[in-house]
């Protein structure tokens, strides 16, 4: 039988200041012999020398081991308050429960004996007469949240209350109100600090738990569960609120968790760990961590609000196949601060709550391959070096379904690795220099932008560095301000698909690709306005731009720029270009290819296509209208092939040019219809009446021009009252085809038509008063030592009240040869009157020329 209970001895020791109570009982053996185990051990064996430690009794070895354990060497840290129950037992079916009992302090037994301190020699001290009524002992409170109440026979650890029972082997059994059990094997009292350290096991003996002088709980063994219902505060380096060493460990943090000074709130080492953090979590200071798990297949559920500042880390998981579910709002501020961190492959973070990152912090960091982030909340990132989501590893997938706002140099999503995918379904707003919405560094990166993208202030919406990148932009994209870029890719074989509406203004750039073999497919509506604004830009060889949507360019902007050799631009949509300096499509590089089967409208000093290339190919098969002071196509270079198969190339503006070709050895084939007819109803028609507009200009040497289509020129004559020795009025100057230079060849196989008009201006009084005489309008003008071969049909019709200089003019040694199949038809000429000078009798005009 037990002559003294462990509980009584512990209480006696606690009252007397004894440092350690471990198996302090007198046990009667089977032979009736009493075993005296009343051994006095040093309170702090850590201060003893190695020789002194060797001389200690064997009963003190648990104390020595206990003092050497890491969980007892943490120093004087702040106390943990209000942790709930630690479940250290299994049920009858050996199913692990989700709630639990906790490590306790020595409890009382059923005895009515008053605890009596042992004598130095092991003799007993006889208690007082039992007739005396003893005074009930007061509860003993320790500074690390442990209370021993002998009267109520309870042990309270943190906020968990247990009843206790002594066992025959000297251990103490604990049981909470739900019937869950645990066992205490050892305990130690620190008299100076009034704290108690406890050590025990689960009911089945499989799990070891320790509650140290700092109020820190350490679980060693599999299938352990800790329920922390109260607020937990951890402060100081190496301080830990709850620690589990073993597989399938679980911590349920219902109370708030506050960690600072380099401490750890929850530490679990082992596979398949789970933390349900339902309270508010606050972590601050370098090396501080709210939750740390080292092991595979970990799951952390942060349901409450988390605030991470000044270099702290909210959740860190080191292991493969980890999952972090952040349902609450996460706020991260300060350099080196991190909300959620996973180091391992197949990591996953589900961010249902909002994510707010500033001051250089990181919201989510994953290092490892095949990571996934589902960000369903609103993400706000601001300040340089701040990153909302960062993944370092291959095959990463980031899904941003909520709205993202990135400002002042921050980055929303950054992925460093190959084969990455970012799906941005929500709206993304990026503002400020060095701000980036989504950034990928690696090959085969892909961004699917289903949501709207709004970029300003020099920010970048999407940045990809690496080969074979793809961006599918299906939402609305708005980019404004200098240096702002909606989509930028640095690498070869890039593909960008702009399917939604894009608006680029004030010096911004919609899409920019720097690399070879790039392709940009623009099937949506694109509007570009303002000097230095660019819709799509490729800098690299073999770049391709396909325009299937509509493109509107104004204010000096450029719709498309393709800079590099062997570049291609194919337009099947509508292009509208207006204002000084505006260019619809600019291509510069050797061997360029341009094709247009869409409709192009150019006006107000703009240029539709600006092409600088040698050995290039230009094919215009759609329709084109050229307005005031504008040029439809401006081609500069040698050995180029130009095919004008346009169903309608109309030059209707003042001082306008349909096609301008400058260079040597170019080939121009006109198979479509070309009309030059200045708009006489325009407000500025009279002002620019004498400034010629031209259908096609060819400047240079050894060029070959062939007309197989139809070329029509309309010329107006403004007539006034006849006066002696003065012209009857004035006629405008317009030309269909002008070829200037030596060695050029012009083959006129198609039809030429010159149509005259009379008094087409709304008010031609100012023009007619100048009395310039007959028109110098000609369908064909060739100047220089070149040859013209006329084989087609030529028609003259309409009104020519002042006469005209000729349908074809060849000058400066130009040669005209009229083939046997050529015809000339004069029809529908209502008037051919002239006064004051003699006009030509034939509708051909030669100046220093030869005709055969």
UniProtKB/Swiss-Prot annotation:
The keyword Nucleotide-binding does not apply. Keywords: Secreted, Signal. Residues 1-21 form the signal peptide. Residues 307-319, 506-516 have a biased composition (Low complexity). It is found in: Secreted. Residues 339-348, 517-526 have a biased composition (Polar residues). One of its GO terms (cellular component) is extracellular region. It comes from the Bacteria. Residues 30-50, 91-145, 307-354, 407-449, 506-531 are annotated as: Disordered. Missing up to 1200 C-terminal residues compared to orthologs. The gene coding for this protein is interrupted by a hybrid IS2D/IS30C element between amino acids 839 and 840. The full-length protein (which is about 2000 amino acids long) is part of the autotransporter family. This is Exported protein YdbA. The lineage of its organism: Bacteria, Pseudomonadati, Pseudomonadota, Gammaproteobacteria, Enterobacterales.
């Amino acid at each position: 039988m037990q002559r003294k209970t462990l509980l009584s001895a512990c209480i006696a020791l606690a009252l007397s200041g004894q440092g350690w109570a471990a198996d302090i009982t007198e046990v009667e053996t089977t032979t009736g012999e009493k075993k005296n185990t009343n051994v006095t051990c040093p309170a702090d064996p850590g201060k003893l020398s190695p020789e002194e430690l060797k001389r200690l009794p064997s009963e003190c070895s648990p104390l020595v081991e206990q003092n050497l354990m890491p969980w007892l060497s943490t120093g004087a840290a702040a106390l943990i308050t209000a942790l709930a129950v630690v479940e250290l037992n299994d049920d009858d079916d050996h199913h692990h429960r989700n709630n639990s009992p906790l490590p306790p302090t020595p409890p009382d037994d059923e005895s009515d004996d008053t605890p009596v301190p042992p004598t130095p020699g092991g003799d007993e001290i006889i208690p007082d007469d039992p007739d005396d009524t003893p005074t009930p002992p007061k509860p003993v409170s320790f500074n690390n949240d442990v209370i021993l109440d002998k009267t109520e026979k309870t042990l309270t650890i943190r906020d968990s209350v247990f009843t206790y029972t002594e066992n025959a082997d000297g251990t103490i059994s604990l049981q909470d109100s739900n019937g869950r059990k645990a066992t205490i094997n050892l305990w130690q009292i620190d008299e100076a600090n009034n704290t108690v350290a406890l050590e025990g096991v689960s009911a089945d003996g499989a799990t070891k738990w320790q509650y140290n002088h700092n109020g820190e709980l350490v679980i060693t063994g599999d299938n352990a569960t800790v329920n922390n219902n109260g607020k937990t505060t951890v402060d100081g380096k190496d301080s830990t609120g709850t620690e589990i060493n073993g597989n399938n460990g679980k911590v349920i943090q219902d109370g708030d968790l506050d960690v600072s000074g380099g401490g750890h709130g929850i530490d679990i080492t082992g596979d398949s760990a789970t933390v349900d953090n339902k309270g508010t979590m606050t972590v601050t200071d370098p090396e501080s961590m709210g939750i740390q798990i080292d092991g595979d297949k970990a799951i952390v559920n942060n349901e409450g609000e988390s605030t991470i500042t000044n270099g702290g880390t909210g959740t860190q998981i080191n292991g493969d196949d980890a999952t972090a579910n952040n349902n609450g709002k996460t706020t991260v501020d300060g350099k080196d601060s991190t909300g959620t961190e996973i180091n391992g492959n197949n990591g996953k973070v589900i961010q249902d709550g909002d994510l707010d990152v500033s001051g250089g912090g990181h919201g989510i960091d994953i290092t490892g391959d095949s990571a996934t982030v589902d960000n369903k909340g609103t993400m706000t990132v601001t300040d340089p070096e701040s990153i909302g989501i960062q993944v370092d590893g291959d095959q990463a997938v980031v899904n941003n379904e909520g709205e993202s706002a990135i400002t002042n140099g921050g980055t929303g999503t950054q992925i460093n690795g190959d084969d990455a995918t970012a799906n941005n379904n929500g709206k993304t707003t990026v503002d400020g220099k060095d701000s980036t919405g989504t950034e990928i560094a690696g090959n085969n990166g892909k961004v699917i932008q289903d949501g709207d993208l709004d970029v300003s202030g020099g920010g970048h919406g999407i940045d990809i560095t690496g080969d074979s990148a793809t961006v599918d932009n299906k939402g609305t994209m708005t980019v404004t301000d200098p240096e702002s870029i909606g989509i930028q890719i640095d690498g070869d074989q890039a593909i960008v698909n702009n399917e939604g509406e894009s608006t680029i203004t004030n010096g911004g750039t919609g899409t920019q690709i720097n690399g070879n073999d790039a392709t940009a497919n623009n099937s949506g509506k694109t509007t570009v306005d303002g000097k230095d604004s660019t819709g799509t830009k490729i800098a690299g060889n073999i770049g391709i731009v396909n325009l299937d949507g509509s493109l509107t360019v104004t204010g000096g902007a450029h719709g498309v720029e393709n800079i590099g050799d062997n570049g291609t631009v194919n337009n099947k949509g509508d292009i509208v270009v207006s204002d000084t300096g505006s260019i619809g499509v600019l291509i510069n590089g050797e061997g360029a290819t341009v094709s247009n089967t869409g409709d192009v409208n150019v006006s107000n000093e703009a240029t539709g296509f600006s092409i600088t290339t040698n050995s290039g190919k230009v094919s215009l098969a759609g329709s084109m209208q050229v307005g005031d002071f504008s040029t439809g196509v401006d081609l500069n270079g040698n050995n180029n092939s130009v095919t004008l198969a346009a169903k309608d190339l109309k030059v209707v503006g003042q001082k306008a040019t349909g096609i301008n070709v400058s260079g040597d050895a170019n080939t121009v084939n006109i198979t479509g219809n070309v009309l030059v007819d200045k708009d006489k109803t325009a407000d500025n028609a009279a002002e620019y009446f004498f400034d010629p507009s031209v259908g096609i200009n060819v400047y240079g040497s050894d060029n070959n021009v062939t007309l197989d289509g139809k070329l029509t020129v309309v010329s107006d004559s403004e007539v006034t009252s006849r006066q002696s020795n003065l012209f009857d009025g004035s006629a405008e100057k317009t030309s269909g085809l002008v070829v200037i230079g030596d060695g050029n060849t012009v083959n006129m196989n198609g039809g030429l038509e010159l149509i005259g008009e009379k008094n087409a201006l709304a008010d031609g009084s100012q023009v007619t008063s100048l009395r310039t005489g007959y028109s110098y309008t000609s369908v064909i003008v060739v100047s220089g030592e070149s040859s013209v071969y006329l084989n087609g049909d030529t028609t003259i019709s309409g009104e020519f009240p002042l006469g005209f200089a000729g349908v074809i003019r060849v000058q400066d040694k130009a040669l005209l040869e009229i083939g046997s199949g050529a015809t000339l038809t004069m029809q529908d000429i209502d008037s051919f009157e002239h006064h004051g000078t003699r006009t030509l009798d034939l509708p051909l005009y030669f100046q220093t020329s030869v005709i055969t």
